[in-house]
Amino acid sequence: MIGAALVLGLVAGTCTGYLVQAGRAPTPLPPLSQPVLAQARGEAPAPLPAAQDRRVRTDGDLRELLLRKPRGATHTEWLKDGVRWLDLTAVAETWTEPGEAFGDLVRDEFRRSVMTVWEDDGHTVEIRLTQFRQEEYTAALHASEEARGWAEELAGDSWLIPGTGDGRAYVMTEPETESGFEDQYTAEAHAWRGDIAMDVWVTGPEPVGKNKIMDVAERQMERL
């Protein structure tokens, strides 16, 4: 009964309201027009040059950001043109577990990767730039951290790369040995800037000095 009364009361009150409103003069509506907004005049500002807008460079040809080989150095036989694009599969195959690496790269929103290799003064220098879409998180930072984690497991010394925040260079004090092959000493550097992760490796039959790996890493980061 109480529930029925409440419903009836609402209906009755609504009907009474309609009857009262019907006997009144209509209320005029406010004007629909809005004040005219002033429009901007003149030409739109010119886009910033690459020197002021980093995205102008990083959204262009990624190969143009690679460090050029020094005078007197030669590109390896399998890289005559000096530069190679790497698709997702090719990058994954550079890891010891390609299947797992492939899934990680998909998760990290891999966009593209490019590399260059040259031989100079008895050493082989390899530089790789990997770019991520970064729509979800800073994948370039994650990739650099992971690479540094692997490098820190090897015996050697390491130093921060100036101007990179947490970028680091590593020199291995013990050579990598494999039956049937010449022992190889390795130095590497890993850093990131924006949506690009940088990896550098320098290998050779003789120990790689700190100055060598730091010079390559710093000059490459300057181009980013």
Language model features: what each stretch is:
Residues 1-8:
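N-terminal export and membrane-targeting signals
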Residues 5, 13-114:
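N-terminal "mature-domain start" segment
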Residues 24, 135-137, 208:
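Residue-level signal for secondary-structure boundary sites
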Residues 117-118, 145-152, 220-224:
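Hydrophobic, Leu/Ile/Phe/Ala-enriched alpha-helical segments that form helix-helix packing faces
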Residues 135-187:
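Short Gly/Thr-rich strand-loop-strand
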Residues 178-224:
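Extracytoplasmic/luminal low-complexity segments enriched in Pro/Gly and acidic/polar residues
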